[in-house]
From Swiss-Prot:
Family the entry assigns: Belongs to the RecX family.
Protein species of origin: Oceanobacillus iheyensis (strain DSM 14371 / CIP 107618 / JCM 11309 / KCTC 3954 / HTE831)
Name of the featured protein: Regulatory protein RecX
Signal peptide interval: none
Function text: Modulates RecA activity.
A Gene Ontology biological process term: regulation of DNA repair
Main location class: cytoplasm
Residue ranges the record marks as coiled coil: none
Record key words, sorted: Cytoplasm
Length: 272
């Protein structure tokens, strides 16, 4: 049995207290420290006698409280998923038993709620990014959110809203300068949008509804540029029909139409 000799406030942390225990010679020595919440909960005061088992319990309670306080600070920046909180506490080397207890308390107090987190996450991604539902789904999955909760949260991202975002992204891409054929640009845009997490069906639907027809003058200008490059590349080793075939195949792979390719061949290789 040990008796509390005195209790002092820590200089740097006013909500923490040092507990000094009485020594056999009538003096005192530092025993342990606790948070104010623990001090109040167990009504610790000068003269109180503590068994070794109780001191151990108080130290464990304080360790748990410090980890809990640390987690609240972590959550103060933004809402987190249960897995994010667990990963954070593991990095802080908190015992698994304490982690489970902290998360249980946080869920009870609504600090941690994966359904609410998923809904806020989806809305944030819709408003501040160009990501589609599949990519958002993957992000939430990596954060440990349950599949049913993800599905429910993604209801905030209906097809019509996806189409609006896809249309804006396509328009922006088509306005940028490019040395590629119109068809190749469309294919690249489709691929890019799928990588962002949009469904191919939604992308195709938007492209069909939009006026994405090629600018003939620009297409011809780009074809001539690409065609001249191919001629320069192949005419050192090929001539006649073989050269025409190489150039035609190269331009076709780049997405140009047969009519334009033939027009270029007729104009550029008429003497071959």
């Amino acid at each position: 049995m040990k008796k509390i000799a005195r209790i002092t406030t820590q200089k740097k942390h006013k909500n923490r207290y040092n507990i000094f225990l009485q020594t056999p010679d009538g003096g005192d020595a530092y025993g342990f420290s606790v948070d104010e919440a623990i001090l109040i909960e167990y009504r610790l005061s000068k003269g109180m006698e503590l068994e070794d088992e109780m001191i151990s319990i108080l130290e464990q309670k304080d360790t748990l409280h410090k980890a809990y306080t640390l987690t609240i600070h972590f959550l103060s920046y933004r809402m987190r998923s249960e897995k994010e909180v667990s990963d954070y506490l593991q990095k802080k080397e908190v015992d698994e038993e304490h982690i489970a207890e902290i998360i249980k308390r946080l869920k009870k107090e609504k600090w941690v709620d994966d359904q609410q987190f998923a809904e806020m996450f989806v809305r944030s991604r819709i408003n501040s990014s160009s990501k589609g539902p599949k990519m958002i789904q993957q992000e939430l999955f990596e954060k440990g959110v349950d599949g049913s909760k993800i599905t429910s949260a993604l209801e905030q991202y209906p097809v019509e809203e996806q189409k609006q975002k896809v249309e804006k992204l396509i328009s922006k891409k088509l306005q940028s300068k490019s040395k590629d054929s119109h068809q190749k640009r469309i294919d690249q845009i489709k691929q890019n949008l799928m990588q962002k997490g949009f469904d191919s069906g939604v992308i195709s639907m938007v492209i069909q509804q939009m006026d994405t027809t090629e600018d003939t003058d620009r297409e011809w200008e780009v074809l001539q540029l690409q065609g001249e490059k191919l001629l320069y590349k192949y005419q050192k080793k090929h001539s006649g029909f073989a050269l025409k075939q190489k150039v035609m195949e190269g331009l076709y792979r780049k997405g140009f139409s047969f009519d334009m390719i033939n027009q270029f061949i007729d104009q550029s290789l008429q003497d071959e």
